Swiss-Prot record:
SMART domains: PUA. It comes from Prochlorococcus marinus (strain MIT 9211). Residues 274-357 form the PUA domain. It is found in: Cytoplasm. The keyword Nucleotide-binding applies. InterPro entries: AceGlu_kinase-like_sf, Asp/Glu/Uridylate_kinase, G5K_ProB, Glu/AcGlu_kinase, Glu_5kinase, Glu_5kinase/COase_Synthase, Glutamate_5-kinase_CS, PUA. This is Glutamate 5-kinase.
Length: 364
């Protein structure tokens, strides 16, 4: 049995002259039904609510205003789920809708609840359809066509494989639409190779922002948790069927042989640091070399404002990020305490090692 997360991009659900949106979704549902009959489990992370909403509302152009996009998404999401429900029902399966925002993952309890809900639905043989809650998410919460969301879902439920279905056949060394020198990349074998590829995606083109760049981020999040990732051309009906039967996508990102684990992945990727804590050299060495917790005595300076139990970055005197974790004290409390000589003795723990992840453990 293989647990799959399948991310279907917006561009794939718009429909073409040859294939309507309904036919496209029917094809995907057919592939999934065949795979489920073999004993596999699946979660779909589906974009497309805004686009379908615009079609339902008769808009000629996609709105630019965030409120218009949210309203269009609320219309489109209903239609999107109707299609998935209709076609999976023809194969004898039920579907469930899961709408998520970034704030849902920032709470460890909500993160666990989402994971348990998804696992229970899978146990019942239901196909969960996950989407970002576009109707209420604001600009700071948008995941980027659900690429990052699909990786976070994959790590939350310990998926075996993540398939990123998109409108390109594979990863290239540069944008093949603008360069004749673009070379296909069929395998990304290790974190250093992935890091090198990410560093080359710099220019603000469709290839570099919100397109392939977010897919590379998703691949990094998933592979460092031990999940195999396929980047594949979802425009071809046979692509998904072949992958679910054991073939490979156009580009395969191979999983880390030393996964960081669910909790560390959550700390590193599901949370947005609210501030930063600058630590001294002794604390740097203790945390990096000995796996120690951060004590109050090792703090030099506080950057930004945060409350107790919020995520923060740990940085050295040069501003380089060393780790991320959950601070047990607020920035105000820390600011009042770090210069108090009485705290040098029996120094309290500010970030326990159980809620701290080293940057060196990640592919960043």
């Amino acid at each position: 049995m293989t647990l799959w997360v399948l991310k279907i991009g917006t561009s794939l659900l718009r429909g073409t002259e040859k294939l309507s949106t309904k036919k496209i979704i029917h094809n995907y549902c057919s592939c999934i039904a065949e795979s489920k009959a073999r004993g596999d489990q699946h979660i779909i992370v589906s974009s497309g609510a805004v686009g379908l909403g615009c079609i339902q509302l008769g808009f000629k152009d996609r709105p630019n205003n965030i409120n218009d996009l949210q309203a269009a998404a609320s219309v489109g999401q209903v239609h999107l789920m109707d299609l998935y429900q209709e076609y999976m029902a023809t194969f004898g399966y039920k579907v469930a809708q899961i709408l998520i925002t970034r704030s849902d993952f920032s709470s460890r309890n909500c993160y666990r609840n989402a994971s348990m809900t998804l696992k229970r639905l899978l146990d019942w043989g239901v196909l969960p359809i996950v989407n970002e809650n576009d109707a209420i998410a604001n600009e700071e919460l948008l995941y980027g066509d659900n690429d990052t969301l699909s990786a976070l879902v994959s790590t939350a439920i310990n998926a075996d494989q993540l398939v990123l279905l998109t409108d390109i056949d594979r990863l290239y060394s540069t944008d093949p639409k603008v360069s004749n020198e673009a070379k296909p990349i069929t395998d990304v074998l290790n974190p250093n190779q992935l890091k090198d590829i990410e560093s080359t995606i710099q220019k603000p083109t469709n290839w570099g922002t919100g397109g392939i760049k977010t897919k590379l981020v998703a691949a990094r999040i998933a592979t460092e948790s031990g999940i195999k990732v396929h980047l594949a051309d979802g425009r071809k009906p046979e692509t998904l069927s072949n992958i679910l039967q054991g073939s490979r996508g156009g580009t395969v990102f191979h999983p880390s042989p030393k996964p960081i684990g669910n909790r560390k992945s959550w700390l590193a990727h599901a949370l947005d640091p609210a501030g930063a804590i600058e630590v001294d050299e002794g604390a740097c060495k203790a945390i990096q070399n000995n796996g120690a917790s951060l004590l109050l005595v090792g703090i030099r300076q506080i950057h930004g404002e945060f409350t107790a139990n919020q995520p923060v970055k740990l940085i050295n005197s040069k501003g380089k990020e060393l780790a991320r974790g959950i601070s047990s004290l607020s920035s105000d409390s820390l600011g009042n305490s770090i210069n108090n000589p009485t705290n040098n003795k029996n120094s309290p723990v500010v970030i326990h090692r159980d809620v701290l992840v080293l940057t060196s453990d990640l592919f960043t």
